[in-house]
Structures are given as C-alpha cells and as structure tokens.
C-alpha cells in the first residue's frame, strides 16, 4: 500500500534530523537495508550447534548457560572460546569464581597464551572490566564465570550476618541495561555462566528451581541453555566421563526447546567423535552390526569407545562423516533427535 506523499516527506525530514543528531543509520527503513544473516560461534558440540538452529551461539548477543554443579557449564564455555579463537577471535574470561583451570582449558583447545583473564574482587569491578573491554571494539567473546560469584562490594565490606536483599539483582539489571546495546554494536558475544537455586517456600505448580542474579538476565539473554549430567560413562568399570543433556530453553534466533546429548570426557571435554557416531547411526550413515561400527567399507571399531578412538586419530574420516551428517540433517526441517537408548551402557 502506497504511503501518503506528505507523510513520506515528514518521515524523510525526521530521519535527516535524527541522523544529524545521532549519526547516520540511527533510524532506517528495513526495505533500504539488506537483512544480514546472524553469524554464530560453534559450541564445539555438533548436536548443540544443530539444536541452536544457526550453527552455534549468536554473535553480538547475551547467552546464559546454567545448570547444577559439575554439569559441564564451564567446559561448554571453554569449548566456545576455543572455537572462537580458531577463527581468529579475541576472547576474555572473567573468572569471578577464581577457579579457572588453565591446564584443562589447554586440553580443550583454548589458546591460553592469548586469552584475556581477569579475577575481579567484586561484582562491580567485574562488570566495569566487562564494559570497558566490550566498548574497545577489539573483543569477540567474553565469558563471565559466574553470576553467583559477582558479589556486590557492599556485601564484601559488610559483616558476615548483614542482609543485602536484592543488591546483586539490581547490580545485574543496571549492568545489562548499559551493555546490551554496546554488545550488538561491537558484535561481541557475552556468555554468563549461572548456577541454580531452589525457590524458598515453593508450593504447587511450576519448577522449584531458579537461577541467581534476579530476572534481568532471563529477559536480556537471546539464548538460554540448561545443561545437566544425565549419566556416567564407564569403561572396564572405570568412570571415564559423563553424559550431558543441553536444552535450549530460550532462543530468539531460532525455534527453542530443542535438545542435544553429548559425552563430556574427564580431562578432554566434549567428545565430538561420540556425537559423530550417535548421529551417524541414527541417520544410517554409520552401520551398527552387533558391537561393530563401520562406515562404508571401513570398520570403525568394536564398541563405541574403540570407534571414538579411531575417529580421534583419523581427523579426515571424522570430518567426512560430519559433513554427511550435516548434509542429511540440513535437508530436514526438524533437528534429528539422538537415539532413544545410548549405544553403550551408562549409569
């Protein structure tokens, strides 16, 4: 429908005035501007990249990764850092918990020599550092570990029994209001790692769990990922890792509520080879005959762990199978679910 000529002139004049005050591009017609594809940073997990709908976590947005203790939150975040660095990105890790394991980060592929690290004393200090490095325009990804450890200065300076109701929530709300627009402008991704707490006096319907830091992060986050440990992985009666499930509970860039399962191996992180086997079998790309797994005419190994070991050594073969999986899933509207039962016994 055609717009009235007088209205067109009035709007054009207003746009010129706005551009003069706030800079060119402050107000544009969508028809005059090409819609850009949302870029993403891989999570290091094939299944989670697919579940997120765009191949990873979106750039220039706020991401929240939360779950119980030892569920894989920091491991997943370190994998995202490693993937970002592989593509030439500059990353920062704000270690509010003062618990970053540098040697473990190296094992996951993080370039620790070029990783910017801060261990702030207070929540205010952490968020000031976050704002400063983001406004610099030279950073691609910042991880804050964790929201629960962003302790306000008033609480640190006060006595042990003092009450500081809502102080951390107000701190987070203020920081997010300031930083959200800057993140978009600088195309910087911000990941908050968060913990869960039980709601006091929770009765009736609804989840008894909540995350720390108030409600602001729930609103400002474009993506929220709930990660949980669902099983232990054993080999020869020895615990070698955990099976984790990640659910995308909020997604502003693709359909939400998709899930992914993957192995987190002790000392190694997310097993990409395990996901290749799981999706390969589900999509009939990898053949499973009894305990034996094979791809085309090549035997991958007897048992899942042996097949994983072979794919870990043969990167070219792993990449070839991964490509076939992506091509197969890409032809479908829905993400292919993982097998209903794991390929090897877990507990």
From Swiss-Prot:
ATP binds at residues 67-74. One of its GO terms (cellular component) is cytosol. SMART domains: AAA. The keyword Nucleotide-binding applies. Keywords: ATP-binding, Cytoplasm, DNA damage, DNA recombination, DNA repair, DNA-binding, Nucleotide-binding, SOS response. GO terms for molecular function: ATP binding; ATP hydrolysis activity; ATP-dependent DNA damage sensor activity; damaged DNA binding; single-stranded DNA binding. It is found in: Cytoplasm. The keyword Calcium does not apply. One of its GO terms (biological process) is DNA repair. Gene3D superfamilies: P-loop containing nucleotide triphosphate hydrolases. PROSITE patterns: RECA_1, RECA_2, RECA_3. Belongs to the RecA family. Can catalyze the hydrolysis of ATP in the presence of single-stranded DNA, the ATP-dependent uptake of single-stranded DNA by duplex DNA, and the ATP-dependent hybridization of homologous single-stranded DNAs. It interacts with LexA causing its activation and leading to its autocatalytic cleavage. PANTHER family: MITOCHONDRIAL DNA REPAIR PROTEIN RECA HOMOLOG-RELATED, RECA. This is Protein RecA.
């Amino acid at each position: 429908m055609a717009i009235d000529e007088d209205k067109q002139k009035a709007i054009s004049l207003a746009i010129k005035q706005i551009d003069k005050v706030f800079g060119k591009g402050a107000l544009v017609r969508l028809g005059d501007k090409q819609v850009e594809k949302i870029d993403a940073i891989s999570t290091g997990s094939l299944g989670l990249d697919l579940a997120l709908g765009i191949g990873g976590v979106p750039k220039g947005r706020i991401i929240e990764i939360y779950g119980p203790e030892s569920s894989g939150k920091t491991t997943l975040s370190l994998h995202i850092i490693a993937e970002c660095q592989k593509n030439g990105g500059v990353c920062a890790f704000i270690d509010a918990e003062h618990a970053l394991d540098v040697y473990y980060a190296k094992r996951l592929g993080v370039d620790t020599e070029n990783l910017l690290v801060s261990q702030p004393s207070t929540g205010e200090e952490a968020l000031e550092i976050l704002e400063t490095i983001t406004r610099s325009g030279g950073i691609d990804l910042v991880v804050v570990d964790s929201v629960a450890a962003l302790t306000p200065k008033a609480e640190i300076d006060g006595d042990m029994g003092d009450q500081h109701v809502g102080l951390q929530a107000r701190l987070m709300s203020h920081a997010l209001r300031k930083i959200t627009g800057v993140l978009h402008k600088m195309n910087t991704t911000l990941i908050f790692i968060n913990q869960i707490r039980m709601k006091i006096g929770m009765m009736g319907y609804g989840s008894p769990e909540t995350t720390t830091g108030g409600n602001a992060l729930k609103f400002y986050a474009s993506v929220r990922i709930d990660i949980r440990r669902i099983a232990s992985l054993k080999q020869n009666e020895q615990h070698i890792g955990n099976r984790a499930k990640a659910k995308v509970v909020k997604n502003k860039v693709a359909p939400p509520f998709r899930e992914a399962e993957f192995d987190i191996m002790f000392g190694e992180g997310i097993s990409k080879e395990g996901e290749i086997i799981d999706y390969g079998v589900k999509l009939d790309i990898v053949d499973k005959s009894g305990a034996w797994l094979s791809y085309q005419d090549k035997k991958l190994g007897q048992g899942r762990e042996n097949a994983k070991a072979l794919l870990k050594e043969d990167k070219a073969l792993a990449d070839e199978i991964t490509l076939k999986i992506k091509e197969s899933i890409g032809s479908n509207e829905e993400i292919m679910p993982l097998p209903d039962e794991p390929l090897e016994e877990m507990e």
